[in-house]
């Protein structure tokens, strides 16, 4: 299964887990990475590898990817899906909290990309999806660090696309709106409290987003959807 490996970070829950299921169903070998990664029910063991690693730790991330490549072949697709959000006003956020958010949301994307990009470029093929947010183009009075990191992810995606498109590498920025995940748990609130704080908008499911990303992946290699914003119809954000 050379050149068929799909690497997903943040794969233990939410969008990452939905992506793992969608790409596995499509027949791909997988490396699923998260800080607390356990085997996923229903995924074939013979073509699924797991690694517990912090995306902010480049050495750990690279080791995990090289190990999976030794078994399944070179990485054909990387999906940088790990992320977190602190919705508090910035004056309430501790420096350690915003530093961690930057480590996961931006440094993690840089680390994952660095681990696979040189080989993709040399081969003349490969796809990198960076899961950003509609917050990468719209500011807000809360979640300031989150917004700043997502602006960075979008700029990184476009810069890499300009640098590597000529080498056959697709870089796709994915900017979801409200997606039903467990991101609220990290804020210490229930989903209903989270939804109310946002003004009770509609939410898409992680599975719906995963299907859209899989569609982008399936397009012929000479077609690159550079930047895609995906939101519920009934939302103003």
Give the ranges of each region predicted by the language model.
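Active-site-adjacent segment of SDR/Rossmann-fold oxidoreductases
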Residues: 138, 159-169
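Conserved glycine-rich cofactor-binding loop
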Residues: 12-13
